[in-house]
Amino acid sequence: MKGNNFNLLGNITWLWMNSSLHKEWSCKLLACNVIPAIENEQYMLLVDNGIPIAYCSWADLNLETEVKYIKDISSLTSDEWQSGDRRWIIDWVAPFGHSQLLYKKMCQKYPDMIVRAIRFYPKQKELGKITYFKGGKLDKKTAKERFDIYQEELATALKNEFNFIEK
């Protein structure tokens, strides 16, 4: 990691430490989630008067890497963060109530994209739910159609991965 990125890493780590969900996570997961985002410039950090207020990162995965990520959220290598065109939010940290602002900024930056995330809740840390978000210019119908296609492809890949047999 380049020297000028250490301040950035410190700002993001500070946000993690102030998040009720993230502060319980390991340094290993911090490194897996944050360093590749910085190296690949796949993040957004919001700062107000010099103080970090919100952060998110994303990876553009191919289907194979997506399956790997679903099975183990800490499994992505730095190279895999740019392996395809299936965008996933890896991290979303807004411990001071700036989540809506971060969402607005992401919608502006990526107006035509479908983005998915595994959403974790503080009381259910072992169980995540796949959610999706759409860019600001994408209509709901088109977004739903794209999401459904992604989900069908993912479901098929997961069935094949785990050798599920349909009755």
Swiss-Prot record:
It catalyses: a fatty acyl-[ACP] + L-lysyl-[protein] = N(6)-(fatty acyl)-L-lysyl-[protein] + holo-[ACP] + H(+). The keyword Transferase applies. GO terms for cellular component: cytoplasm. This is Leukotoxin-activating lysine-acyltransferase LktC serotype T3. GO terms for molecular function: acyltransferase activity. One of its GO terms (biological process) is killing of cells of another organism. Belongs to the RTX toxin acyltransferase family. Coiled coil: none annotated. It is found in: Cytoplasm. InterPro entries: RTX_toxin-activating_protC_bac (IPR003996). The keyword Acyltransferase applies. Keywords: Acyltransferase, Cytolysis, Cytoplasm, Hemolysis, Transferase. It comes from Mannheimia haemolytica. Its EC number is 2.3.1.-.
